[in-house]
Curated annotation (Swiss-Prot):
Keywords: Amino-acid biosynthesis, Aminotransferase, Histidine biosynthesis, Pyridoxal phosphate, Transferase. The gene is hisC2. The modification N6-(pyridoxal phosphate)lysine is found at residue 222. Belongs to the class-II pyridoxal-phosphate-dependent aminotransferase family. Histidinol-phosphate aminotransferase subfamily. PANTHER family: HISTIDINOL-PHOSPHATE AMINOTRANSFERASE (PTHR42885:SF2), HISTIDINOL-PHOSPHATE AMINOTRANSFERASE-RELATED (PTHR42885). It comes from the Bacteria. Homodimer. It is an enzyme of class 2 (transferase). It catalyses: L-histidinol phosphate + 2-oxoglutarate = 3-(imidazol-4-yl)-2-oxopropyl phosphate + L-glutamate. Pathway: Amino-acid biosynthesis; L-histidine biosynthesis; L-histidine from 5-phospho-alpha-D-ribose 1-diphosphate: step 7/9. This is Histidinol-phosphate aminotransferase 2. The keyword Amino-acid biosynthesis applies.
Length: 365
């Protein structure tokens, strides 16, 4: 029996816009200094890992996870200072939460808006849901263009506005007054993405119950738990109840919940790691700025964005680092405003010294 060739069958079954995409690339990091994904470079201490192992042993795997986990919710509220009156929703990282928000709010053709460039998944999740994504360009200095953003909100009437605070990949933290103006202008929901909040020393979380059209979204990925895939959304219970309706059943597996509960009993360890990375950010930025032909942008995250405009452009520098087994994220071709830009995660002092030494050799050759 002969059938239709697989490519033809795929063309009939899979959406054209999906076939035009490429899968999210993840570089092979074996044997490399990994400074490309804003991960915490420090492994958890032995006593924390022991508690994780104990929690995993005691977790029944033959049952589905409970629809709600009041004990874990209480831990998250205490650990991350979520207001007692706020609704709380868990997701598999912030990626799933972005999907849930757009699915709940947007019909095909509705607008999702964000300053741009920013977190790429705002755009992707909107398009996957047949929403229209509007990215409002940042200034040439990669700052928020507030007049343009307010004009775009007025023109496009977005159902959802995403604000990354601080912004990824630029590192900028938009002023409170600008965020306030966007909150006042937005006709729908404003999502305050605080993925990098532990490194910024600034949050909207204590004020979230005063904002009728906003929610705060966070992840634990940047503070040492990237492998766990856990994010949470906080805001008025009425918003959270709507997003909960589109949450997949049993979306948070029992092991992730058990591991998070074990780790949160050691929250000071996570805080200390974040504080260390925050302290090491400026020396890394200063070292980059001292290199010939390098411009460094201010960052409130656990990374630094640098533009290479000397003898070698961003693509060439990225390749040269890769040959030296040092991975950083190349944004040179991602957006015109990011031409020749590389994003470098803050690593351990040894890793930071290694990338600076390698760049010194590369740029002086």
């Amino acid at each position: 029996m002969t059938g239709v060739a697989a490519p033809e069958r795929i063309a009939r079954a899979v959406r054209a816009d999906i076939r035009a995409l490429t899968a999210y690339p993840v570089a092979d990091a074996a044997g490399c200094i990994k400074l490309d994904a804003m991960e915490c470079p420090y492994e958890l201490p032995a006593e924390v890992r022991d508690d994780i192992a104990r929690a995993a042993r005691e977790t029944p795997l033959n049952r589905y996870p409970a629809a709600a986990n009041p004990a874990l919710q209480a831990q998250v509220r205490q650990a991350f200072e979520v207001p007692a009156q706020a609704g709380l929703l868990f997701g598999n990282g912030s990626d799933e939460l972005i999907h849930l928000i757009i699915q709940a709010c947007c019909e095909p053709g509705d607008t999702v808006l964000s300053p741009w460039p920013s977190f790429v998944y705002f755009d992707m999740a909107a398009r996957l849901s047949h929403a229209r994504f509007v990215g409002v360009p940042l200034t040439a200095g990669l700052e928020l263009d507030l007049p343009a953003t307010l004009a775009a909100i007025e023109a496009h009437q977005p159902k959802v506005v995403f604000l990354a605070l601080p912004n990824n990949p630029t590192g900028g933290l938009w002023p409170d007054a600008a965020v306030r103006a966007i909150l006042d202008a937005a006709p729908g929901l404003v999502v305050l993405d605080e993925a990098y909040q532990p490194f910024a020393g600034h949050t909207w979380m204590p004020r979230i119950m005063d904002e009728p059209n906003a929610v705060v979204m966070r992840t634990v990925s940047k503070i040492g738990l990237a492998g766990l895939r856990f994010g949470y959304l906080a805001g008025h219970p009425a918003w959270i109840a709507e997003f909960d309706k589109v949450r997949p059943p049993y979306n948070m597996d029992v092991l992730s919940q058990a591991v998070l509960a074990a780790v949160l009993r050691h929250k000071p360890v996570l805080d200390a790691q974040a504080d260390r990375l925050r302290a090491d950010r400026q020396p890394l930025a200063d070292g980059l700025a001292a290199l010939p032909g390098v411009t460094v942008f201010p960052s409130a995250g656990n990374f630094v964005l640098a533009r290479f405009c000397g003898k070698l452009d961003g693509n060439a520098v990225h390749l040269a680092l890769k040959t030296r087994k040092i991975l950083v994220r190349n944004f040179s071709n991602a957006h015109p405003l990011l031409a020749d830009c590389l994003r470098i995660s803050v690593g351990t002092p040894t890793e930071n010294a290694a990338v600076l030494s390698a760049l010194q050799d590369i740029l002086s050759a």
